[in-house]
């Protein structure tokens, strides 16, 4: 048995959708116990709602200390200028105690993202890896593990580094079936590796 956490931040719901799909892929692996949680919102409620934020997200809010309870953590964040969202950064900045005790060392880590126009998705994932590397986590990219990576018949997120979706400049585009297939593959791939390492 391997415990897998899908931990995300989503403002408009794109990453929430991706997170639930990643979890679906992980749950399809025998021996994977999968939980979906989100990081706390740091914006004031009124500002969040005025910006069009999606308030009705069902996942419970995580506490940084509980990351040590999992064998694998799959992180999801929208890109902010080629970096993770500030809400995710604030959450991870509270894991210094875990780092000092090596609590995440050897655990599996992977990242997925969303972008407005496609710019920054790979940079967001690889810059996120820096934090995971400092924790000593085993970084899991996707490579080109499923055919959807090679289909260029439509706008498509998804990179060898991690799943992604392109939301459009106004956020109106929702994750496509191909993007969701890549997200599902990421969950499955990480869960399988977590079981090999920790199961």
From Swiss-Prot:
Record GO terms (molecular function): flavin adenine dinucleotide binding; FMN binding; NAD binding; NADH:ubiquinone reductase (non-electrogenic) activity; NADP binding; NADPH dehydrogenase (quinone) activity
SUPFAM superfamilies xref list: Flavoproteins
Domain Flavodoxin-like: from-to ranges: 4-190
Pfam families associated with the record: FMN_red
Reaction(s) the record says it catalyses: a quinone + NADH + H(+) = a quinol + NAD(+); a quinone + NADPH + H(+) = a quinol + NADP(+)
Official protein name in the record: NAD(P)H dehydrogenase (quinone)
Organism: Marinobacter nauticus (strain ATCC 700491 / DSM 11845 / VT8) (Marinobacter aquaeolei)
Enzymatic class: oxidoreductase
Key words, A-Z: Flavoprotein, FMN, NAD, NADP, Nucleotide-binding, Oxidoreductase
PANTHER family recorded: FLAVODOXIN-RELATED PROTEIN WRBA-RELATED (PTHR30546), FLAVOPROTEIN-LIKE PROTEIN YCP4-RELATED (PTHR30546:SF23)
Binding-site residues, FMN: 10-15, 79-81, 114-119, 134
PROSITE patterns: FLAVODOXIN_LIKE
Keyword flag Nucleotide-binding: yes
UniProt xrefs under InterPro entries: Flavodoxin/NO_synth (IPR008254), Flavoprotein-like_sf (IPR029039), Flavoprotein_WrbA-like (IPR010089), FMN_Rdtase-like_dom (IPR005025), NQO (IPR037513)
Keyword Plastid: no
